[in-house]
């Protein structure tokens, strides 16, 4: 049984909230994070959860938008062996929208070979590229919440290591080899953490996006 303690977490100064375990620590407490990101990490398991606010990609269709962002992420990170394993259809979040216009949500799940697995691969302040010989196999979960009336694509991305290369720096923190299943260590599986973060995502202050109430 999971021993994770879930709680409502404040994002972007409280303008947004979401719910996920306390074991994910706010990276901004230890180093600077870009203004458009909120980054949380469990260093004991080398798992991370990232919230990003991006300008709306008007040239990307709603259908498969999460897959597009997942593949774009793989290109940015020079990931090898990228496979999109699952993608959702398009659905509306009636409880999340500006002036009655619901958000559009799609999700995708894939696998990548990366030479780093934690939050640093997104921040560009990494441990240092370690090369192809030190790649880890990582599960990546991505949700795209499209807030069209405020011109914003929200990305929620979760990273879960599957296989840690003994040559990677991650091995020093969590050990090399196949990752210990979360349930075996009393933690909620990353898929459930991701689901909670997405389904409990709420905007409290639309002024964050420059929108008038």
Listing of model-derived features with the role each one plays in the protein:
Residues 20-23, 45, 144-154:
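Short, solvent-exposed coil/turn segments at beta-strand boundaries
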């Amino acid at each position: 049984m999971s021993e994770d303690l879930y709680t409502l977490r404040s994002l972007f100064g409280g303008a947004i909230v979401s719910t996920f375990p306390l074991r994910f620590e706010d990276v901004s407490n230890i180093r600077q994070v870009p203004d458009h990101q909120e980054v949380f990490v469990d260093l004991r398991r080398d798992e991370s959860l990232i919230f990003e606010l991006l300008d709306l990609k008007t040239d990307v269709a709603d259908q498969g938008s999460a897959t597009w962002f997942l593949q774009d992420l793989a290109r940015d990170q020079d990931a090898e062996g990228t496979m999109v394993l699952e993608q959702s259809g398009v659905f509306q979040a009636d409880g999340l929208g500006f002036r009655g216009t619901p958000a559009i949500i799609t999700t995708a799940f894939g696998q990548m070979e990366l030479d780093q697995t934690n939050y640093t691969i997104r921040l560009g302040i990494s441990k240092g590229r370690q090369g192809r010989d030190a790649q880890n196999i990582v599960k990546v979960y991505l949700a795209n919440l499209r807030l069209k009336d405020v011109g914003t694509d929200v990305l929620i991305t979760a990273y879960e290591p599957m296989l840690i290369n003994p040559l990677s720096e991650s091995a020093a923190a969590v050990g090399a080899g196949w990752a210990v299943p979360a349930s075996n260590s009393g933690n909620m599986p990353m898929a459930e953490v991701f689901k909670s973060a997405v389904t409990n995502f709420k905007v409290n202050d639309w002024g964050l996006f420059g929108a008038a109430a």
